[in-house]
Structure formats: structure tokens, C-alpha cells
């Protein structure tokens, strides 16, 4: 693909991506439709907590189970609150290129900082086809940064070094959200790309490991339940206080393990926790994600209390 616009790498503003970026949760009303009020309320919550930005319409946003119109409504309501206050990365990948491009154009029109995309799912495509898919999406938002989302355990395909080399020919590509489990992948991507690109840590349970080995930002699905803890963890890492950082990471992980022990989906647990701890009304999860059952409420309450206890201990 010939790139019509050649943006200078020296003009990139990577600083706005460095820090804690919670993945934004899907917000529904009682009928299961997108709740604009819920979206704006959650955005205000993140502004208040002081996080660096938000990652919208990704896995935590249940994007796989939402329509193109749903995802537009979510992003529009995020931007009503977040513009000028938070870095906004919009995940725009759909099961086909046309819809992905539509969301990319929409996101650029709203003024997001970056768009992101997983690779095509279901069919195992050759790397040149994956590159074509990503570049076609990027071309639909020619003035917007592009983040590659590497999550092989769910997408079924991994970002290889060869594919990463090919994608760096696109001047809009600024880095990788790396959610593969080996921390070594972060080191390899960072070492290959250098200072002109940013690598985001994906797995929340290894926030500390990812940051230490080279990730300068982090995007995670549990940050929203306990942003203060991850902000403190990031602060400790930046200050070289590794013993304290490790204690906070361990505490966060225990909370994650508790949240994952319910019958219902983890995001259903998190939404219930945010209702208890923060008074947020975000609704349930969209089927086929499993909803909470009555027996899960004890787990929800325990996890909510664990977050409160950890905040008292470490903040």
C-alpha cells in the first residue's frame, strides 16, 4: 500500500499515551441498550480519578457483541466528556474491513487521539492480508495515530516481528497494545521499534513486569475497578520503589483472582463492584456473556471490600 501522507515520527506526541489507561466498560440501560448517561458517568469517573486516558470499545467494552451504531453512540458520549481531559484510544476493528473503516472515520471525526484494531478473527489469514486489513483501517483515518492490538489468545493470530516490521512502514502506526502473556514480547517489540514507538502492557496481572521490561503505558480491563491502586503502582515503578510496587501488584492480582471466581463474567462483577464502591449504574453484560447469579453477590461484596482495604493500605 502506498501511503499518501508521510507524518514525521519526530512530531509524534507519545507522552499522552504514557501512563494508566483503563479499558472502558460497556454501559447498558435496563433494556440492555447503550446508556448514554452511563457512558458519560463512567467517563466523568475516570476524569475524576486522574487516569491518563481511556481505551474505548475494546474487549472490556464488549465490542464483539455490539453493532456499529452501538459503538458510535458509546464513543460520541465518551468524547462529550473526555475531550481535552483524557487521551482517548478507540478500538474500531469489526469482523469486516468496511465496518472497521466506518468506525475509523467516525472516530477521527470526533477527534480521538488514536484508533486501534485487533487482527481479523475466525479465518486464519496470511500476514499480508492482516497488514492489508490494518492499513485499510488506518487509511480511513489518515490523520489519526494507529495502535496494533496483539491478543493472540483470543484473536487466534499473533503479531510476529516480520508483520510488525511491515506495519511500521505505515507512518500512522505508533505502537502495540500487547496482551500476549509472555512479557518477553514487550521487550522484543520495544527493542525492535525503539523510542519512536510506544508499547502498552496488556495483561493486568503483570503490569509491573511489563512496565519494567519496556512498556511505557498500560491498558487494562480491571484498572477501572481500582484505578487508584494502578496509579499508585505506576508511581512506585517510576520512582524505583520496587518492593512497594510488588506488594501493590500482588494485592491487585488477588482482587482479580477473586473477581474471576464468580459464575458471571468478570465484567459483570466489575460493574457490580463499581455500583457498590462508586455508585455507578453501568447495567449488566450483553449475552452471550454470562450474567451474575445470586451466589455471585458474596464474591462481588468480598472483591469490593478487598479494593477498599487495599486502598487504605497503600494510598
UniProtKB/Swiss-Prot annotation:
GO biological process: N-acetylneuraminate catabolic process
Taxonomic lineage: Bacteria, Bacillati, Bacillota, Clostridia, Lachnospirales
Pathway where this protein functions: Amino-sugar metabolism; N-acetylneuraminate degradation; D-fructose 6-phosphate from N-acetylneuraminate: step 1/5
Protein family per UniProt: Belongs to the DapA family. NanA subfamily.
Annotated localization: Cytoplasm
The protein's assembly and partners: Homotetramer.
Name the UniProt record assigns to this protein: N-acetylneuraminate lyase
GO terms for cellular component: cytosol
Documented EC number(s): 4.1.3.3
Induction: Induced in the presence of 2,7-anhydro-Neu5Ac or alpha2-3-sialyllactose (3'SL).
Predominant localisation class: cytoplasm
Molecular-function GO terms, alphabetical: N-acetylneuraminate lyase activity
Inactivation phenotype: Deletion of the nan cluster abolishes the ability to grow on sialylated substrates. The fitness of the nan mutant is significantly impaired, with a reduced ability to colonize the mucus layer in monocolonized mice.
Record: residues binding aceneuramate: 59-60, 179, 202, 204-205, 221
Active site: 149 (proton donor), 177 (schiff-base intermediate with substrate)
UniProt-listed InterPro entries: Aldolase_TIM, DapA-like, NanA
Gene3D superfamilies reported for this sequence: Aldolase class I (3.20.20.70)
EC class: lyase
Alphabetized UniProt keyword annotations: Carbohydrate metabolism, Cytoplasm, Lyase, Schiff base
Reaction(s) catalysed by this chain's protein: aceneuramate = aldehydo-N-acetyl-D-mannosamine + pyruvate
Presence of keyword Nucleus: no
Pfam families xrefs: DHDPS
Its biological purpose: Catalyzes the reversible aldol cleavage of N-acetylneuraminic acid (sialic acid; Neu5Ac) to form pyruvate and N-acetylmannosamine (ManNAc) via a Schiff base intermediate. Cannot use 2,7-anhydro-Neu5Ac. Involved in the degradation of sialic acid, which is present in the host mucus layer and represents a much-coveted source of nutrients for R.gnavus, a prevalent member of the normal gut microbiota.
Amino acid at each position: 500500500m502506498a501511503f499518501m501522507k508521510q507524518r514525521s515520527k519526530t512530531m509524534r506526541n507519545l507522552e499522552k499515551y504514557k501512563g494508566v489507561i483503563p479499558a472502558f466498560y460497556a454501559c447498558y440501560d435496563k433494556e440492555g441498550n447503550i446508556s448514554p448517561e452511563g457512558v458519560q458517568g463512567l467517563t466523568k469517573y475516570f476524569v475524576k480519578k486522574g487516569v491518563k486516558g481511556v481505551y474505548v470499545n475494546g474487549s472490556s467494552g464488549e465490542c464483539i457483541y455490539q453493532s456499529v451504531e452501538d459503538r458510535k453512540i458509546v464513543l460520541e458520549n465518551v468524547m462529550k466528556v473526555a475531550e481535552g481531559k483524557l487521551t482517548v484510544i478507540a478500538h474500531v476493528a469489526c469482523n469486516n474491513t468496511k465496518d472497521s473503516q466506518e468506525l475509523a472515520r467516525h472516530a477521527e471525526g470526533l477527534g480521538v487521539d488514536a484508533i486501534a484494531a485487533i487482527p481479523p478473527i475466525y479465518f486464519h489469514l496470511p500476514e499480508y492480508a492482516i497488514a492489508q486489513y490494518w492499513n485499510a483501517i488506518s487509511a480511513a483515518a489518515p490523520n489519526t495515530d494507529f495502535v496494533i492490538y496483539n491478543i493472540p489468545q483470543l484473536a487466534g493470530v499473533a503479531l510476529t516481528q516480520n508483520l510488525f516490521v511491515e506495519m511500521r512502514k505505515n507512518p500512522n502506526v505508533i505502537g502495540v497494545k500487547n496482551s500476549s502473556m509472555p512479557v518477553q514480547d514487550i521487550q522484543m517489540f520495544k527493542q525492535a521499534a525503539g523510542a519512536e514507538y510506544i508499547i502498552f502492557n496488556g495483561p493486568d496481572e503483570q503490569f509491573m513486569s511489563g512496565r519494567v521490561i519496556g512498556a511505557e503505558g498500560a491498558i487494562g480491563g480491571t484498572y477501572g475497578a481500582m484505578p487508584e491502586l494502578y496509579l499508585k503502582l505506576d508511581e512506585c515503578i517510576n520512582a524505583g520503589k520496587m518492593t512497594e510496587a510488588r506488594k501493590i501488584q500482588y494485592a491487585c492480582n488477588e482482587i482479580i483472582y477473586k473477581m474471576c471466581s464468580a459464575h458471571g463474567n468478570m465484567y459483570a462483577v466489575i460493574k457490580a463492584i463499581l455500583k457498590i464502591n462508586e455508585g455507578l449504574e453501568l447495567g449488566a453484560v450483553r449475552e452471550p456473556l454470562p450474567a451474575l447469579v445470586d451466589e455471585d453477590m458474596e464474591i462481588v461484596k468480598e472483591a469490593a471490600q478487598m479494593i477498599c482495604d487495599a486502598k487504605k493500605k497503600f494510598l
